[in-house]
Amino acid sequence: MMNSNEIRQSFLDFFKERGHTILPSASLVPESPNLLFTNAGMNPFVPFFLGKQKCPYVPPRIADSQKCLRAGGKHNDLEEVGYDTYHHTFFEMLGNWSFNDYFKEEAIHWAWELLTQKWGFPKERIYATVYKPAPDEPGEFDEEAFRIWFKLFQKAKLNPLLHIHFGTKKDNFWMMGETGPCGPCSEIHIDLTPDGQSEGKLINKNSPLCIEIWNLVFIQLNANEDGSFSLLPSRHVDTGMGLERVCAIIQGTSSFRQFNRTISDYDTDLFIPLIEKLQDISKVSYTGSIPPTPDFALDPQLKKDIAFRVIVDHVRALAFAIADGILPSNLGRGHVLRRLLRRAIRFGQILGVNPPFLFEMVDPLVKIMGSHYPELIDKQGHIEEVISSEEELFARTLSHGLALFEEIKQKMIAEKRKEISGKEAFVLYDTYGFPLDLTQLLAKEQGFSVDTQGFERLMAEQRRRSLLSHEEDIVSLTKTSQFVGYEELEAEAEVVVLLSANRAIFDRTPFYAEMGGQVGDKGYVVFDQKKIEVLDTMKSASGAHVHRLAFTDDLKPGSRVYLQVDEKRRRCIAAHHTATHLLHWALRKVLGPETLQRGSYVGPDRLRFDFSHTGPLSAEELAEIERLVNEKIELNDPVTAEEESYEKVKNNPDILQLFGEKYGQRVRIVSVGRYSKELCGGTHVRSTGEIGYFKILGEYGVSAGIRRIEAACGKALEQFLHAQAAEQDKKWQILHSKDPSLPRLSKWVDTLDLDSLIEIFQRRNEELSSFEKEIKEREKLRAKKQEENFRREASQQAMAAIAQVEKIGAIPVLFLDCDAKPQSYLPLLWNEISKRIDSVAILASRSEGKINLFIGVGPSLTTKIEARNLLSQLVASFEGKGGGSKTIAQGGLKDSIEISSLFEKGRGILEQYGGQKGQTEPKATG
């Protein structure tokens, strides 16, 4: 059975063999100003369809897998996500295109060949739709497509009249807009009913048992402004097939061997690792339940399963959008991202998870999709940081906002009204950052509605109030600054504009703006005998250096000021930046030329360097890399920079470029000696001797095929060592509290030279490692002895418990209160019980400030009852959480609960199971 990467690649290979140029996915940020996001596979090729550009490939055929996002504007699937098996905000669209080259014959034949011969779709389960217009609809019956399909089904010994269905403009005519290129389309559907005998009766009926998998669009007409349609001089093919849907069909039917269950995109390898990670985080089990109808009353497990699907969907959308340079904000695309993130956090609360937690799900996503989308690997750290910081930002106001919502709810109940006023919704938005759709989601859960018109009126008023300052900011960000900071650290300048939040742009500046992994400069603005601290420097979209100041006071546009960069800080940053170039060179020397930079952080305190490599580096490799860097530092080689046109240098193999970076027309080439050349806009030392001693502090993996080295040099290294020495002392204190007999660490002497400090630091690390190992061994022996005692005790308790078995219907059941035993004791006890009797056991104990709960179900009883289902109902009654499998499940509850009440509730639930044979989900008890 193929996984998602194999399915995607086989599609691309299939069309490559048929003369198509394979293109990487375009960005989620579209070229068109009319689109929020790239939301369809054809978006990047609109200029070809419109005739504004000629397809540059010979033959003019393209295939790709395009990233798409639908979460705002006209194409918006947000509200459907989670409530069914196939709607997503982010998805991949597999597509092949012909620009005035092949047409219907090849497009249909190749689609049939890929599906039935390459992928093995059962021919008898495939149905095709063909355009047949109703009166007053454009164009004519697509007889050409009909005849092609007729012959294919006839050749497959299938009845074409059963397998070809006709559709009107609604389903089988594609238009780019009110005017412009358009044409009929032919959809391919697959019958997923158990017997495969639906005869196409479920086509376009929103049934999960008959799914559209591929749409073949034949662009042959032009919609004119007068409402008429005319033939285009050139004809094109545009096809689209959702990767998630294909994976669901192939994997959900075990390569077409099983059709006895509803397939789901979320049961594929694109989503399963994310769901498993979320189960680990939340300690809640995902069961895959789906509401049978949109208005179905949701029970607790359905709500949780919907939450799982919403969260894993939104994490995918967030990660890919951030990788393409979109950041959460209050405007445009950024606002959509912020809404997605806050919705995901709200659904996380249904699982009992509080932020930050979404960022933890980026790593499994990178492992799933990073091989095809390297931008995920390159930007993983950035994606995690953005999501985590945004989660923390919202977490600070979430609880207050929810408290206000609760007040609103109680007030509404008292006033017997069902609609949240526009003012109440606006306060939640304006004060606590709740997007309108989040308030609507909360309202929906309570059976309320929201006065959206009133909300929009208040929003419009707020926009009018802020319009002046907003326009000022937007206009000002068209300004540019002259950067003089390569040569100067102080400069006279004039204030060009003051922005909100104490930000300022000057006509010229020595302050480096954060870019390319290097942090922005700090320092001072001297004005009117006052020093104003510069807290950070960033770059605007127009290239202006935006300085964030502690205050602006009397500053105004036109003010003459004196700018001073923090020289010590800048020198540390410059040393670390040049050190990254030396490190890059040394890595390629030791590991091979295929080793390339995949990201970096250059700050005053240390450097971080991500690079492509499989597997950890050996101690010998790290030592050699460190030796090579320090060797070049000792040689005091010159560091020079020159500007050149990008066109002239872009194909020069001797000049390294950062993968995925977009360069301007003019670039800066930084050379170290005669051995290192890189495109780089950062600040550097004048010669390598200024770097000082270089030390690798750590090496570890950050994602599949990407390793990270952290290092420091010179004065920053010395400060790091002193700080770490204090941490070593703290660590020793913790270990000493566990074992007072531990000897003291080697003494730290602040006044020693750097080489001696490094030597003592390493010796102390070795001592701590030895102490830790010794204590771990003792704890391991202690734990082993405790487990042996527990096993003996569990065996004795299990023997005695057999006499306490009670029958509930046909089910033998044990309820055991294990007093103050830890959670680890309960599975040992179940193991002993299950050796002796096939039963259902509900075990509980009270320890570490909570109730531990364990449920075991004997293998012969799982057809009647599953442990995870029983647990989910039990913990839901007491606001606990947990998860598990068919045979075992465990969870935790508040310490205030009486175990006898817990058992009584369990008994009531089991009575429902015991009385109904073969039932896997009993009716809820009161």
UniProtKB/Swiss-Prot annotation:
Gene name of the record: alaS
Native organism: Methylacidiphilum infernorum (isolate V4)
Main location: cytoplasm
InterPro entries: aa-tRNA-synth_II/BPL/LPL (IPR045864), Ala-tRNA-lgiase_IIc (IPR002318), Ala-tRNA-ligase_IIc_anticod-bd (IPR018162), Ala-tRNA-synth_IIc_core (IPR018165), Ala-tRNA-synth_IIc_N (IPR018164), Ala-tRNA_ligase (IPR050058), Ala_tRNA_ligase_euk/bac (IPR023033), Thr/Ala-tRNA-synth_IIc_edit (IPR018163)
Localization (cell): Cytoplasm
Source organism, top-level taxon: Bacteria
Function: Catalyzes the attachment of alanine to tRNA(Ala) in a two-step reaction: alanine is first activated by ATP to form Ala-AMP and then transferred to the acceptor end of tRNA(Ala). Also edits incorrectly charged Ser-tRNA(Ala) and Gly-tRNA(Ala) via its editing domain.
Name of the molecule in the record: Alanine--tRNA ligase
Family statement drawn from the similarity comment of this UniProt entry: Belongs to the class-II aminoacyl-tRNA synthetase family.
EC number: 6.1.1.7
